[in-house]
Amino acid sequence: TIQNENSRDFIGHIGGDDFIIVTEFERSEELAGRIVKAFDEIAPSFYGKEDRARGYIISTDRQSNIQKFPFLSIAIGIVHNMLRPLASFAQVSNIGTELKKAAKKKENSSYIVDRRKD
């Protein structure tokens, strides 16, 4: 866990492997960076020595084909209302989903900040 000094932050579980953190925009990138760094430091410990040496795991995919898979990573989307108004939770959720998908396309753990004004 990341130690968080701001008692006004809210951390919640949306479902599956999705979580939400509500924080001040000014702290969001610093907090996301700390989460990414902490996650990437601990993730290799979930794997055996051989997998860590290789840098990936070998396993079967959903079609029973043997594949190489990267280690776990974390993708964070930062949604805020500093550049445009947000009208509903559904809008926040949709933007968050878009950002998370974009962050997952990167090779390693990452975060993306919504910078759109429309």
What is each stretch, according to the model?
Residues 27-32, 86-88:
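Short, conserved charged micro-motifs
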Residues 10-13, 47-97, 110-116:
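A short glycine-enriched loop-to-beta-strand structural element that forms part of the catalytic core
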Residues 35, 93-99, 103:
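Regulatory helix in c-di-GMP signaling enzymes, encompassing the GGDEF I-site helix
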Residues 42-45, 99-102, 106:
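Conserved, well-folded catalytic cores of nucleic-acid-processing
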Residues 24, 66-70, 102-103:
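A general structural signal for short secondary-structure junctions and capping/turn motifs
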Residues 1-30, 37, 44-56:
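Conserved helix-loop-beta segment at the catalytic/binding core of cyclic-nucleotide signaling proteins
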